């Protein structure tokens, strides 16, 4: 079943002048695919994209169960749409947000916009509850729209459009921007896991280094951070942490150093490691595949 979040937009390649677009003409439909679970790779060894070809796709995102991951209510997808003319000149940029609610995606409510968008000077002039192709571009041959999407937990930007990315945030991307050219076309947003998941199952003292950075709206770019040490007290029920290691990577649990190994292609992206602090491994830990 397609998970369609309806935001308005339009596109045409018709040379004949057209009237102002109707709502039906201007809709951009987003197929929000589930994200692949950790440890899933394609045949070439790269992190697997979500979706595949099955019409009945399993959910694979954020409730981090041993079996699968699910999108959770409260999750937010930030979407940027760039509209170009036939000369490939950027003419208009819009930002929108889709929120998971009751097992479905919806636009932000008026109250959520008042609480979280209105105070954000950097975002509010680009923000649209529903994204529609600009009337001045509708019906012009050669126009197109590029779409970007990013998941950053359930966070909203601060007044400067910044969202902090720390080890408790699972960042999820689409692999490339999506281009749409035709009215009524469904934009299929397929996601992948760019980070590594470390699942600690019980209380312990955990230490590791990670890149902490800031995601910037509306530009959809990252502000360089620092490779910082993290000294964390894992709660009794355990916790998941997300980071981007490079080469061989070492963590410390209750003072014992543990080496994490990459997959056969030397990559940590999309890999998952589960460690029980009461049964620490005697050697390096390989990813779960």
Residue ranges and their predicted role:
Residues 1-2:
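Sec-dependent signal peptide recognition
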Residues 11-289:
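Sec-type signal peptide cleavage vicinity
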Residues 6-10:
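C-terminal motif of bacterial Sec signal peptides marking the signal peptidase cleavage site
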């Amino acid at each position: 079943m397609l998970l369609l979040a309806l935001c308005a937009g339009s596109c045409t390649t018709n040379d004949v002048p057209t009237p102002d677009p109707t709502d039906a003409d201007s809709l951009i439909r987003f197929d929000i695919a589930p994200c692949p679970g950790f440890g899933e790779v394609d045949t070439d060894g790269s992190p697997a994209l979500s979706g595949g070809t099955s019409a009945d796709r399993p959910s694979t995102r954020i409730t981090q169960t041993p079996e699968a991951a699910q999108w959770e209510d409260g999750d937010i997808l930030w979407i940027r749409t760039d509209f170009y003319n036939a000369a490939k000149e950027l003419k208009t940029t819009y930002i929108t947000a889709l929120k998971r609610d009751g097992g479905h995606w919806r636009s932000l409510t008026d109250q959520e916009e008042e609480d979280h968008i209105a105070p954000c000077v950097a975002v509010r002039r680009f923000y649209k509850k529903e994204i529609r192709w600009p009337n001045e571009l509708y019906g012009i041959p050669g126009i197109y729209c590029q779409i970007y999407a990013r998941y950053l937990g359930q966070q909203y930007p601060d007044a400067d459009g910044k969202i902090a990315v720390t080890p408790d945030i699972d960042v999820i991307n689409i692999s490339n921007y999506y281009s749409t050219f035709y009215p009524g076309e469904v934009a299929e947003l397929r996601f992948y896991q760019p980070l590594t998941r470390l699942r600690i199952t019980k209380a312990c003292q955990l230490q590791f280094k990670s890149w902490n950075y800031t995601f910037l709206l509306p530009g959809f770019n990252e502000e360089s951070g620092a490779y910082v040490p993290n000294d964390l007290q894992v709660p009794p029920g355990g916790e998941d942490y997300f980071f981007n290691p490079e080469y061989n990577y070492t963590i410390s649990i209750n003072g014992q150093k543990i080496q994490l190994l990459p997959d056969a292609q030397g990559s940590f992206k999309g890999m998952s490691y589960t460690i029980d602090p009461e049964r620490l491994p005697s050697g390096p830990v390989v990813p779960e595949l």
